[in-house]
Every structure is written in structure tokens, then in C-alpha cells.
């Protein structure tokens, strides 16, 4: 039996490399990392600062939610998430504001997080800052960089000599 010329999978990278359809060597692999703005704006998982919803941010539904991460991490851990995954210049002030605010009550919604970020960000910079903050927590919650690193290692193992990976 001849192997298929094209295999399309709609799943997370961690699951993709366990698929029986991916046995053997490939001359090319395409990894789509994109999250579309339409997904963010219409999503009810807390991925967007434009839609008020629960602070979940999980793509798959398992693992720690953004709400749990925000409410259980130390100020230093939050700072590192914002700095490393969002490259946010105001990481320290935002981390401090999150920890201060959660002493009053648990942070549960996207609009609560948005309000905290806006409170310590000059108006002209708020949209850009909100984008970086939400990106940082999404990456942390979904372990996106760890998953990508794992996926690239697995993809290289499956590649035929001279094959290509497109990310």
C-alpha cells in the first residue's frame, strides 16, 4: 500500500505526533501556529480582552486555567510570564497590580484583568499592552513554547533526508 501524499490533522501538536497517520518519513511538514483574530474576538475561553468571559485561555480544556495561574502565582512568577512571553515593558508594575488586586478578591474574568492592566498603563499604550499581557498568559497556560520545542524535535525525527519543515 502506497502512503498518502498529504495528511491533514486538526489537533494540538502534542497529539499530532502520536497519530498513526504520521508513521514513516515525510518530505515536508507544515506546523500552523496561528491563532486568528476572529478566534480571539469571538471566543468565550478568555483569550481576548475585548470579550468579557471567564479567564480560562486553555485551548484543550485540560491543565491550569489562566484564572488559577493568575490567582496562585507569585508576583515574581507573573513578572516572568509577562516579561518572557509578552515582552511587556511594564511587567513589574502589572504583576504588582495583579497581586494587590487579588488580595481583595479572586480575579475571574477577562474584563477584571483588563481593568487591572489599564489601571497601570498610560491610555495611548493600553491596547498594545493588553495584547501582550493576554498573549503572555495564553502562552503560559498552554505551554506553547514547550509544545513547539517538543513538536519540532519530533518533526525532525520524522523528516526524510533533504525534507523541510515550515512553521
Residue ranges of each PLM-predicted region?
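S-adenosyl-L-methionine-dependent methyltransferase catalytic core, i.e., the SAM/SAH-binding region
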Residues: 1-166
